[in-house]
Amino acid sequence: MFSLKRQQGASFEHQARLFLESKGLIFIAANQNFKCGELDLIMNDKETIVFVEVRQRSHSAYGSAIESVDWRKQQKWLDAANLWLAKQNMSLEDANCRFDLIAFGKTPQDIQWIPNFLD
């Protein structure tokens, strides 16, 4: 059985997927796990593969959802994306891709989309 935190995370990831689909992106995959980390969502935006990190913070005692994506998390995100691309016979060097952040506040309606978060 999923923990409450995992259930909440899955709910926010689902809301992020619906939000991005409403903006025209097409779902490819979710929850792709690698030793170095997880890719929450992988979407397609026209000819671009979009690796989406979904973050949520119910209060700011430990910083905002955006602030929680520190250098270490960014490196894990890049490494996981490169491993996923390798499974598709691609790499970060030759694939048209970007890294977007979906940050939630307390509720699924409190959503912020930051395309090209890693630039």
UniProtKB/Swiss-Prot annotation:
Which Pfam families does the entry link to? UPF0102
Task: Give the residue spans that cross the bilayer.
Answer: none
GO MF entry, a single one? nucleic acid binding
Protein family according to the UniProt entry: Belongs to the UPF0102 family.
UniProt name for this protein: UPF0102 protein HI_1656
Organism equals: Haemophilus influenzae (strain ATCC 51907 / DSM 11121 / KW20 / Rd)
